[in-house]
């Protein structure tokens, strides 16, 4: 009986795939674009992105086509992350997830009800290919925490970059459990790959991203949550009938922070946050840098720490400003002039009632400066001490 049910479920899944393919084929996708252009026309999907060059934010934005990013977990944060990277024109996107789309996922962004039952990576790939056919999308539908699949995951992020045989440029962790985070952490420490860890709290009102550079900053095992440190099984913490809360707003904000910092890292602009948190209750955004733990349990992390400490530190060269005869500003576009401290200040004359519009009268008129000075001089000259007055009275 159970075997027959499994067969029926497999048939239903195949029919859903065929139906999805039929719907996709009816939609007309745009043709591929060989080269990014800054031309401002309605038919150019990259004109707004290339405008970052004209505004001196990014140099050579089209370099993004040479980058490969792996997104692990295509859920509330991961699906939006993949969507943003696709719209930004990333060169290659590698998706990892083994879950299926459910109607319970509809409170999040990206997925649609007609995709229920499809694998998340498959549903995401079809939508993303339609959004931007220029992006090369690769999908992997398996659990990376098993022994065999971990080796497959390790090989993929090491050899499936934009150029085959090269590692990916960045790994983005968008998973919702500590076991998967530890697997990503172990893989990136072993292969010395930079990666971002992200997450949203179970009450859905806070999130964070963390940029991990092996050896330079703390890895996920350097300062693990209590659940990981105590080797507690996460499944035992979940009560029956109780699930984590989820808000598309918090998911979208966290994904936005994640992709924003990923772009800054990939295209070398701005400052990449080592850790950025978000608390929705009071709109609090803490930033910090976590240093690696010299007693970390991950041996590869300890190895990366030694390698980082052995690197020669960059020498800071201070420029000798005094030796330059050229002015600091060759041109003075705004006509700014420096005024000496001892130069008299020209104060504007106070307004008079006669100078205002007819029918209006000033509530207070400042006295003329000459009269004020004369009154002050007269007051000073009339002042006599008490001793002098008593001496004058005695002499009378």
From Swiss-Prot:
Which residues does the record give as ATP binding sites? 76, 97, 120, 143, 177
Residues forming the catalytic site = 243 (glycyl thioester intermediate)
* A GO cellular component annotation in the UniProt record: cytosol
Q: Which InterPro entries match?
A: D-isomer_DH_CS1, ThiF/MoeB/HesA, ThiF_NAD_FAD-bd, Ubiquitin-activating_enz
Q: Tell me a GO biological process for this protein.
A: protein ufmylation
Q: SUPFAM superfamilies from the xrefs?
A: Activating enzymes of the ubiquitin-like proteins
Q: Which GO terms describe its molecular function?
A: ATP binding; metal ion binding; UFM1 activating enzyme activity
Residues annotated as binding Zn(2+): 219, 222, 296, 301
Q: Which UniProt keywords apply?
A: ATP-binding, Metal-binding, Nucleotide-binding, Ubl conjugation pathway, Zinc
Establish whether keyword Zinc is in the entry: yes
Q: Which protein family is it in?
A: Belongs to the ubiquitin-activating E1 family. UBA5 subfamily.
Q: So what does this one do? A: E1-like enzyme which activates UFM1.
- UniProt-listed PANTHER family: UBIQUITIN-ACTIVATING ENZYME E1, UBIQUITIN-LIKE MODIFIER-ACTIVATING ENZYME 5
What's the protein called, per UniProt? Answer: Ubiquitin-like modifier-activating enzyme 5
